[in-house]
Design a protein with these regions (language model features):
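A residue-level marker of the well-folded mature domains of exported/periplasmic proteins
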Residues: 2-20, 25-358
Length: 358
């Protein structure tokens, strides 16, 4: 998800060609079960923050060097696999483990923080010697992280950042998108789609996660930076779900009939908004919708005229996550943050890029 203007705080290391060329075996598409195995569909590294210095000797006072092919790796999924992002994320981890011949056990917390803690503790008890975790919240996993530390089990985090924890101490490292920049790019797309005029409603993501905070900040700050004439007239959480996205949009349109644009902080809420607009007898394009994710449903929404633009957030973490574990155990080292690059779907490229959506 490479775009000019993206900044990374901290030292930026040069990413090796090998890392840039990583691709996984077939990754299942979320909507139709098809596979997206082309390099253009896979995550690409844009930059790393901090030196690639976390090694077994430095992590948590020192942990054993192990061969990934001889151990069990655990993957903790935070949310039920009911939306394309989570379906594709889990499948990518499974596909890459199979490709590398690594024994994998998986859990799903069903959007319950206490269950995710118990899941992680349970995988450690089952003998997992390394973990990949997709955190439900940016905070609150302390008991699970403590269990991993005590057992000398390294933890690689993906997607949501543990904002109060320290890399190479509480967890190994993090791989994910620059969510602030996603919000900035969404603002740019909104300005273009609306001609920089109108009333905007924001469908906020779930509370307590850095994704929501950063996507909101990026969007609002960019409107200010561009001296935009757009006016934010309402914002309410849709919890990243289609059902709540529809319900909240219905409430917002009823209270603010002058809304002419919607910024949805993920595609599921955007598709819920589309359903709500249809209920108000709106026509495609009457209300401009900009969203973030890159699901097939949202990209198809561009082709159908209901969605004006989509900023990608790529969930295919498998190749980079397992490569990070390989680099860790080999002594090559892992960076504090690995930022991936995101595409943008527009009416100009939606048809040709639909196959790369998930």
């Amino acid at each position: 998800m490479l775009r000019s203007g993206r900044t990374v705080h901290g030292a930026v290391a040069v990413v090796s060609l090998a890392a840039l060329m990583l691709s996984s075996a077939c990754t299942k598409g979320a909507d139709d079960g098809s596979s997206n195995s082309g390099d253009s569909a896979q995550q690409q590294v844009q930059a790393t923050s901090g030196a690639a210095s976390c090694t077994p000797e430095k992590y948590n006072g020192g942990v054993p060097k192990l061969d990934l092919k001889t151990i069990t790796v655990g993957f903790a999924q935070s949310e039920k696999e009911a939306n394309p992002f989570r379906i594709t994320e889990t499948q990518s981890i499974k596909d890459e483990a199979a490709k590398r011949g690594i024994k994998l056990i998986t859990t799903n917390a069903q959007s319950d923080l206490n269950k995710e803690i118990a899941d992680i503790q349970g995988m450690i008890a089952q003998g997992a010697k390394a973990l990949i975790i997709s955190p439900l919240n940016s905070e609150g996993l302390d008991p699970a992280l403590k269990a991993a530390q005590d057992a000398k089990v390294p933890v690689m985090t993906i997607d949501r950042l543990l904002t109060t924890k320290t890399a190479c101490k509480d967890y190994l490292g993090w791989i994910g998108s620059d969510f602030v920049v996603q919000g900035q790019r969404a603002a740019d797309a909104m300005i273009k789609a609306t001609g920089d005029t109108g009333n905007v409603a924001i469908l906020l993501g779930a509370s307590g996660v850095n994704v929501t905070v950063d996507r909101t900040k990026g969007f609002k700050d960019q409107l200010v930076a561009k001296a935009s004439k757009l006016k934010i007239v309402a914002e309410q959480t849709g919890d990243f779900t289609r059902e709540k996205g529809q319900k909240v949009t219905e409430q917002l349109i009823s209270a603010n009939p002058g809304i002419t644009a919607i910024y949805a902080e993920n595609d599921e809420m955007a598709l819920g908004a589309v359903a709500a607009l249809k209920g108000f007898n709106k026509k495609p394009g009457d209300v401009k919708i900009i969203t973030i994710d890159g699901t097939k449903g949202a990209v198809q929404g561009i082709l159908d005229g209901w969605i004006a633009g989509v900023i990608e957030s790529n969930p295919r973490f498998g190749p980079l996550a397992f490569q990070a574990l390989e680099d860790f155990y080999s002594g090559k080292g892992v960076a504090e943050k690995t930022i991936i690059s995101d595409k943008e779907y527009t009416k100009e490229n939606a048809a040709s890029e639909l196959a790369n959506a998930y």
